[in-house]
């Protein structure tokens, strides 16, 4: 094939990809609906995870387009550069161009698979946070206020809290860890997690980081409350593992439960219950950090 044809196909591919990208971006902006009034709502359970999923879904068509046409256009460009050569040089160049094309296909495919795997993980996390929030819902009738995906900055480190409850029993932070089971490697106890007060032992191995992270978040949140409201109280940390059986062999500062056990764990009377005024004061603080849902 004449190099002019290669150049034409290459140019067409670039123009086609650019046009598709521009059209997709225009349609995405044009289809945004406008509400009758400007809402500013509290975040729902898994709100930040859902936003990430939506961002991935919005970029997926363009990702697939670039990953399919990118290696093809690049391969054509390489072959166009090799075509004017002659003899052994052309053969070697053709082989290298073919290897370059195959490498592009490989890395593009791996990139797409990673994006799809990330979306699957995020969807599992979102479902876990929804399941925990649903089990906590009855506490609202008992005077609790519930906040989801609370993000707090400016305290030395960033806090991203899945669920925060404020009620007569005090302040409780509930972190959700949703992990899928791997029945091929786990054996007969694939549904169990052991907690000895210091670490989690999953079927595939121990995990100290999760407990330490939840504990540190509770301590940091307690300090932030004291600085922001003047109310000094310990924050109770709870780690929820939806869908897992918890084998408790010890007690620690972090309560570890599944979604069915969480209600009785949170609704434990504190030594010094919070007053209605304190509940309202603390709740207003949390609202400032998770009331940003506009559409």
Language-model-detected regions and their locations in the chain:
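Surface-exposed interaction regions that form or flank ligand-binding interfaces
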Residues: 1-158, 169-171, 177-185, 200-295
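Phosphate-centric recognition/catalysis
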Residues: 162
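Conserved hydrophobic "DFG−1" position in protein kinase catalytic cores
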Residues: 165-166
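Short, flexible, mixed-charge acidic loops at enzyme active sites
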Residues: 184-196
